[in-house]
Amino acid sequence: MTTMATQGAWLRMTSSAKSMTKSTVTSKELGFLTSQLSGLRISYTPSDVINRISLPSFPGIQPIVARRICPFTGKKANRANKVSFSNHKTKKLQFVNLQYKRVWWEAGKRFVKLRLSTKALKTIEKNGLDAVAKKAGIDLRKK
């Protein structure tokens, strides 16, 4: 034998099932006031897919920060082990010794402000700015 509470719930379920077949479910019946999917497009048309494919894809936007790489030598940070007294090793970065330096460019008859490693500075003193820039593929006219 069923009690009145369970019979009432069963009657409500059958009446709501009939109303669902006839019309759409309202937000009051679902138990929340606004739709959780409001503002979202669930279906796409073929033109949307074509537009997304045909758009040029750009790599992730890099922050405007000077990278710690020497443009002349290609030197970059080295991952090294920091070894403690107990021989416990932890990784650390050994950065390149980059310096901002104004270098005289003889062919352009002017100073060029560069960010280069101290090793590149020694190489420029030995071989000349034009030779080192040409080998690295750097156009000094832009700087």
Curated annotation (Swiss-Prot):
Q: Which InterPro entries match?
A: Ribosomal_bL28 (IPR026569), Ribosomal_bL28/bL31-like_sf (IPR034704), Ribosomal_bL28_bact-type (IPR001383), Ribosomal_bL28_sf (IPR037147)
What does the record say about the knockout? Answer: Seedling lethality. Albino seedlings unable to grow under photoautotrophic conditions.
Where is it localised?
Plastid, Chloroplast
Transit peptide per record: 1-66
A GO-annotated cellular component: chloroplast stroma
Tell me the GO BP annotations in alphabetical order.
translation
Sorted alphabetically, the keyword list is: Chloroplast, Plastid, Ribonucleoprotein, Ribosomal protein, Transit peptide
UniProt-recorded Gene Ontology molecular function terms: mRNA binding; structural constituent of ribosome
Domain of life per record: Eukaryota
- Keyword Chaperone on entry: no
Where is it chiefly localized? plastid
For whether the record's keyword set contains Electron transport, the answer is no
Q: By its UniProt entry, which PANTHER family does this protein fall under?
A: 39S RIBOSOMAL PROTEIN L28, MITOCHONDRIAL, LARGE RIBOSOMAL SUBUNIT PROTEIN BL28M
Subunit relationships: Part of the 50S ribosomal subunit.
Instruction: Tell me the protein family, please.
Output: Belongs to the bacterial ribosomal protein bL28 family.
Name of this chain's protein: Large ribosomal subunit protein bL28c
Give the organism, scientific name.
Answer: Arabidopsis thaliana
